[in-house]
Amino acid sequence: MAKKPSAPNNTKPATIHDQKATRGNGGELHQIAEGDTPVLTTAQGGPVADDQNSLRAGERGPTLIEDFHFREKIFHFDHERIPERVVHARGYGVHGFFETYESLAAYTRADLFQRPGERTPAFVRFSTVAGSKGSFDLARDVRGFAVKIYTKEGNWDLVGNNIPVFFIQDAIKFPDVIHSVKPEPDREFPQAQSAHDNFWDFISLTPESMHMIMWVMSDRAIPRSFRFMEGFGVHTFRFVNAKDESTFVKFHWKPKLGLQSVVWNEAVKINGADPDFHRRDMWQAIQSGNFPEWDLHVQLFDQDFADKFDFDILDPTKIIPEEVLPTKPVGRLVLDRMPENFFAETEQVAFMTQNVPPGIDFSDDPLLQGRNFSYLDTQLKRLGSPNFTHLPINAPKCPFQHFQQDGHMAMRNPVGRVNYQPNSWGEGPRESPMKGFRHFPSEEQGPKLRIRAESFADHYSQARQFFISQTPPEQRHIADALTFELSKVETPVIRERMVAHLLNIDETLGKKVGHALGLETMPKPADAAVATRQDLDPSPALSIIQRGPKRFEGRKLGILATDGADGALLDALIAAVEKEKAAFELIAPKVGGFTASDGKRIAAHQMLDGGPSVLYDAVVLLPSAEAVTDLIDVATARDFVADAFAHCKYIGYAGAAVPLLERAGIAELLDEGTIELTDAASAAAFLTEIGKLRVWGREPSVKLK
């Protein structure tokens, strides 16, 4: 009988710094299950002896096909990915709850709006629209703001954006607008950018997009944080009460920490320094217990009120200004828990506009009607089965029963004889006319036509209203964004066509962009189906700066410190930051930290090369007189100061930092936003002052686009 071969000896002890393991014949490490450590198994439950080597014929021979552990592991890896969303592919999800402020029984029979103080579980996914799953966070783009509320009457999905209007009026154009903004099909670039010919060619031939373009070219499209942006339901919906009386409703999420965005040059640099900037910001806020909140506001109106407008309330490219119809707070959304597994929850969550509880109904908005089909249809391809509602993140949290059965990956399988109704066996579930969803019996009439209502035809008036509602800095940013985007368009006639549209919105804006693009002669204003109204008043609610915060709460201060930094001043700054409910990070030449003047050794959060000032809402310079002589020769230190100044941020500095201000080229430009810090009182005053966030009066002098 042949001698039984012995297994290779993989039990030589090895230590890698703090980790104990064993070393195999080839020098590879093996971590062995001991004590209470779980044993690694296959997906079938079989324990695994060696997860570092495949089965071979001899130590240098071919891999054997009988190695079922290898085959299972590679098989699963090869099929890990699912198709990414065709839009909103890059997203970030957070758990929380919705709390009702007061009963809305007069308007809706939806259960979650009946009892003040009642909390309902919620899941929110924030996203960009155009970029792929691996794109950067701070693209100039619309942000998705999709909320799934697990009510006692089923899931309610309010699938919104951070902009209250959209590019198109009819869902049949949705493939076209998305195709145009995605990478061009013959070259597969640019990624997560609208600055290319296809997008602007489509927009320039789609006048209904002009209002949306004003929003996307504004600072709304480059938010500082998910926590500092509004959300909108976009469409007009209906509330329906127990008497089957209908009230039109528009939904608004308003952040309690106020609105805030970045500037374009800052966004570009943030994307290079931290492509996950928005994700990291949300993660850090939740982990530190600073749970972001939004108030849910509604605009409520009836048909008589709607009939007073020159535009159509079914048009998703229009808003009802808050000054015309004030919003009413009806509840709050609090986000307080991160997902336990990104794929299982954030990636597999399925939002559908059709998911509404009894008491909330649809309008005839043609974009909403199309979304109701598309958002259901897309889940089959992406999640692979009609049973995507079996996934825990998508399943209702209320009791549910139905006769839908079988299909791929069915995880909820009913038992018993009955799988249909009506049936004779006395078994449910049964329909309930009283509790069930009842569509509002609106009267409809007219022939079948492929035609758009004339009430949808005014494409420029609200675009103009948005522009004139902005402060001068915000208007500059819109003009600069249009100039930048159109400068990337290679086809001159497309640029000229867009300028012709801009002249209809605001003549000064159109000429400014045209001159910046180098047009020798201005085109004629584009033909308009309806002339631009000049009598619409500015709406301050449309401005970020006018709706910005009053405090530094929720923001982050970057403190650049070196060996010998003033320890007392640093302690005072940290105390002031914490009192303001803000955050801070210490940046030092080395991540190992620095020794303050009082002898304390303090660890840094970031090394200077990895912590540029673009990552912070305001900065403080705390070098020592000795260390600053070396710091002034470091390019990243000079950039830290110059960028903060150019981006109109507040800069606090100790007296020893003056040489750094000089080398950064701003010593002769100091203004009310550059503040010397000397003691605890000045530190506290600085934290109060920086609640304004930006010194916009500085912007014309820095001439930074």
UniProtKB/Swiss-Prot annotation:
It catalyses: 2 H2O2 = O2 + 2 H2O. This is Catalase C. Its cofactor is heme. It is an enzyme of class 1 (oxidoreductase). One of its GO terms (biological process) is hydrogen peroxide catabolic process. It comes from Rhizobium meliloti (strain 1021). Either KatA or KatC is absolutely required for the protection of the nitrogen fixation process. One of its GO terms (molecular function) is metal ion binding. The active site is at residues 88, 161. Heme binds at residue 375. The keyword Metal-binding applies. GO terms for cellular component: cytosol. Its EC number is 1.11.1.6. Decomposes hydrogen peroxide into water and oxygen; serves to protect cells from the toxic effects of hydrogen peroxide. Could protect cells in nodules which have a high potential to produce hydrogen peroxide because of the strong reducing conditions required for nitrogen fixation and the action of several proteins. Residues 1-31 are annotated as: Disordered. SUPFAM superfamilies: Class I glutamine amidotransferase-like, Heme-dependent catalase-like. InterPro entries: Catalase (IPR018028), Catalase_AS (IPR024708), Catalase_clade2 (IPR024712), Catalase_clade2_helical (IPR043156), Catalase_core (IPR011614), Catalase_haem_BS (IPR002226), Catalase_immune_responsive (IPR010582), Catalase_large_C (IPR041399). Signal peptide: none annotated. Belongs to the catalase family. HPII subfamily. Keywords: Heme, Hydrogen peroxide, Iron, Metal-binding, Oxidoreductase, Peroxidase, Plasmid. It comes from the Bacteria. Induction: A threefold increase of the activity arises after exposure to heat stress (37 degrees Celsius), to sodium chloride or ethanol for one hour. Not inducible by hydrogen peroxide.
